[in-house]
């Protein structure tokens, strides 16, 4: 069995923690490990091959770092230049597998879900395997035991030709209103759509070609034009842009005669909004979930998330409060589905808080914006041992570097020299420069930028060991500067 982990989502409903450049799957929201890492861990058992990860190309190094932290490897990473929904992502993966002679069962699952009962998951997988080996296309359905309006529903019907415990899909239902959701629960035979699938690679491609040939043909051409970049396959952007944006459900599962449901009663949650995150976390005696420096008084059923500041709440009921260094979100727990629309509104206003946190992770380390004004910005930069920033130049700003700890190797035009703790240097405007950590411990520096323009797109890169381009880093103009 080949796990295919879909990790391309933006997780906008969990803003302000989840942001475009560091979405929810890479956050530790329900324990020590991130949702992506938890997904990886639950797939390590006999019969499972190393996973294939499909992610946005901007997240490649986050994926590699979180894999390395668990001492795990993938058999492939597919880097999408942008999202085109789940059907193209799975099609490209299936085509790659078939081309390599690996026509195995593909277990397709999102990177950002929670499954609490590992043994129940494995029992469901065993039943699904028997079914998929017969040529069926399995969807894992979570028995609908309460009227949820945030999930799509699947109506099932008995089929004597299927293994015991497996039923045929008779209808897909979009996210219902509360009245219809109650009717579904009372009627029985309805499941929440988990977004998890099991089918043979060639079977998926056969059904995709039959029911959505545009996606099939475009993905075939896209794969031919894609290039291998080290451990990852870089999906060709120009061809992929022509691919229809469609989900597995719409493209195949709603049209095929082979769709069936295997029940998944394993403590599943898609952690799709703040209320569902509240549900899966441990609560105090009054039903409150807290994280960070939080003090609660006379409050019940709240989700309070602090990130640096003391957060104190009094007399609240069913309220979500999320504090970060640069944004705060407060909502009634029944209204958190509106967070996605709030993010869209902020994007329309050109707000940068939806894109990055003040602390930004890069393959070489991270940087944190400490202070900023009209013509200056102060950043704390951390460079991992042996890592280096790109060789670059800025047209509108100068930089002052002060070493706080570790050793820095500095390139400034033709000069290369070392700086140690408490030493500093000046990088003039238009100087070609680079920062490297040649030591065994992290390098910490304070950078003071000054100039007429401090936008992220004021960067010209000449060399980069991580293969990044100016376009990758520039992306969105923000107040923080990519390196």
From Swiss-Prot:
Annotated signal peptide: none
Organism domain of life: Bacteria
GO biological process, one term: GDP-mannose biosynthetic process
Cofactor remark: Co(2+) (for PMI).
Molecular-function annotations in GO: GTP binding; mannose-1-phosphate guanylyltransferase (GTP) activity; mannose-6-phosphate isomerase activity
Pathway: Nucleotide-sugar biosynthesis; GDP-alpha-D-mannose biosynthesis; GDP-alpha-D-mannose from alpha-D-mannose 1-phosphate (GTP route): step 1/1; Nucleotide-sugar biosynthesis; GDP-alpha-D-mannose biosynthesis; alpha-D-mannose 1-phosphate from D-fructose 6-phosphate: step 1/2
PANTHER family in the record: MANNOSE-1-PHOSPHATE GUANYLYLTRANSFERASE (PTHR46390:SF1)
Quaternary state and interactors: Monomer.
Function: Produces a precursor for alginate polymerization. The alginate layer provides a protective barrier against host immune defenses and antibiotics.
NCBIfam families in alphabetical order: GMP_PMI
UniProt name for this protein: Alginate biosynthesis protein AlgA
Native species: Pseudomonas syringae pv. tomato (strain ATCC BAA-871 / DC3000)
């Amino acid at each position: 069995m080949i796990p295919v982990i879909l990790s391309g989502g933006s997780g906008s409903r969990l803003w302000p923690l989840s942001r475009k450049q560091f979405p929810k799957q890479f956050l530790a929201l329900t324990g020590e490990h991130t949702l992506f890492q938890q997904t990886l861990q639950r797939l390590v058992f006999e019969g499972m091959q190393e996973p294939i990860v499909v992610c946005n190309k901007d997240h490649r190094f986050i994926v590699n770092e979180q894999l390395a932290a668990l001492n795990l490897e993938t058999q492939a990473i597919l880097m999408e230049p942008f999202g085109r929904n789940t059907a193209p992502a799975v099609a490209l993966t299936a085509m790659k597998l078939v081309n390599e002679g690996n026509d195995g069962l593909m277990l397709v699952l999102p990177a950002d879900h929670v499954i609490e009962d590992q043994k129940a998951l494995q029992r469901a997988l065993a039943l699904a395997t028997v079914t998929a080996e017969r040529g069926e296309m399995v969807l894992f359905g979570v028995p609908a035991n309460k009227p949820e309006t945030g999930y799509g529903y699947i109506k099932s019907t008995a089929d004597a030709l299927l293994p015991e415990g497996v039923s045929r899909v008779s209808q897909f239902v979009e996210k219902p209103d509360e009245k219809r959701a109650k009717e579904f629960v009372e009627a029985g035979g309805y499941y929440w759509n988990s977004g998890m699938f099991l089918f043979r690679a060639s079977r998926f491609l056969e059904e995709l070609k039959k029911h959505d040939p545009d996606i099939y043909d475009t993905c075939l051409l896209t794969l031919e034009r894609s290039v291998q970049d080290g451990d990852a396959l870089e999906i060709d952007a120009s061809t992929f842009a022509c691919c229809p944006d469609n989900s597995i459900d719409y493209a195949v599962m709603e049209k095929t005669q082979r769709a069936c449901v295997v029940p998944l009663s394993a403590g599943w949650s898609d952690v799709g909004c703040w209320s569902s995150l509240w549900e899966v976390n441990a609560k105090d005696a009054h039903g409150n979930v807290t994280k960070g420096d939080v003090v609660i008084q006379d409050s019940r059923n709240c989700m309070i998330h602090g990130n640096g500041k003391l957060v104190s709440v009094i007399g609240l009921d069913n309220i979500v409060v999320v504090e970060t260094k640069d944004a705060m979100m407060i909502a009634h727990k029944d209204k958190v589905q509106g967070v996605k629309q709030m993010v869209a509104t902020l994007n329309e206003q050109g707000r940068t808080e939806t894109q990055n946190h003040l602390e930004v992770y890069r393959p070489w380390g991270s940087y944190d914006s400490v202070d900023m004004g009209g013509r200056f910005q102060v950043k704390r930069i951390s460079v991992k041992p042996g890592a280096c920033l790109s060789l670059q130049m800025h047209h509108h700003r100068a930089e002052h570097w002060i070493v706080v700890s570790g050793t820095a190797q500095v390139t400034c035009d033709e000069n290369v020299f070392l700086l140690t703790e408490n030493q500093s240097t000046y990088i003039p405007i238009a100087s070609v420069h680079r920062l490297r950590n040649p030591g065994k411990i992290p390098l910490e520096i304070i950078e003071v930028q000054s100039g007429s323009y401090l936008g992220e797109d004021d960067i010209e890169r000449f060399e980069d060991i991580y293969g990044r381009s100016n376009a990758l880093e520039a992306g969105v103009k923000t107040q923080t500067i990519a390196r």
